[in-house]
Amino acid sequence: MEDYKAFLDEKMSKVLLSLDNEYKTLRTGRISSNIFDKIFIQYHGQRTPITQVSSIRIPEARLVVIQPWDKTILNKIEQAILNSDLSMNPSSDGSVIRIKVPALTSERRQDIVKHAKKIAEEHKISTRNIRQDLNNKVKKQEKESEITEDSLKRILDDIQKSTDIYIKKIDAILESKIQEIMEV
C-alpha cells in the first residue's frame, strides 16, 4: 500500500486543477475570455460552449467582441449571454456582438466572493472524501491482515497530513482569488 501517497497526490492534484478551472470562469475586476466558458447554446442539436463557435477578443479593458463563425447563431449567443449570471448587456450589429463591460459594483464583488468561497468549500469536501475513501481502504487492509496496526496508524497520519496540506492550498488559492475579485 506504499503507492497510496502517489494515489492521494494524483487525486488531490486533480481537485486543485478543478478548482483553478472553476475560478477561471469567475468574473473579476479584469475581464477575461474565460468567463464565457460556461455559456452554452444549442448548435446542431448539441449543447455547445460559445467559445467553440466564435472568437472572443478583448480589444480594450472594458470591451468584449464576440464574432460567431456562423452568423445564424448570433442571436442565440446574444440570448445566452443575457440569460447568464454575468450581468452583461450584449449588442449586435448583425455580424459581431459587442459587450461594454461595466465595472463591478461592491455588492456584485461580494456576491462573487461568496460564490468563490462556496466553490472552495465544495473542493475541500472533495478532498476530504478522497481522504475518507483511502482511509477506508487502508483500514480494510489492516482488518484483512495485509498491513500491521502500526503501519495503519502511520499511513492514516500521512493521509491526514497530505489532506491538511491540500486544504491549505485550497485556502491559499481562495485568498488569492478574493484579492483579485476585490481589486478595483
UniProtKB/Swiss-Prot annotation:
The record's annotation in InterPro entries points to:
Ribosome_recyc_fac (IPR002661), Ribosome_recyc_fac_dom (IPR023584), RRF_sf (IPR036191)
From the UniProt record, which GO molecular function terms apply? ribosomal large subunit binding
Q: Where in the cell is it found?
A: Cytoplasm
Sorted UniProt keywords = Cytoplasm, Protein biosynthesis
Has the keyword Nucleus been applied to this entry? no
Q: Has the keyword Cell membrane been applied to this entry?
A: no
GO CC field: cytoplasm
User: Source organism's superkingdom?
Assistant: Bacteria
Q: Which GO terms describe its biological process?
A: translational termination
The similarity comment for this entry is: Belongs to the RRF family.
Q: Which NCBIfam families match?
A: frr
Its function, per the record, reads:
Responsible for the release of ribosomes from messenger RNA at the termination of protein biosynthesis. May increase the efficiency of translation by recycling ribosomes from one round of translation to another.
The protein's name is Ribosome-recycling factor
Q: Please report the organism this UniProt entry assigns to the protein.
A: Borreliella burgdorferi (strain ZS7) (Borrelia burgdorferi)
Q: What is the lineage of its organism?
A: Bacteria, Pseudomonadati, Spirochaetota, Spirochaetia, Spirochaetales
Gene behind the chain: frr
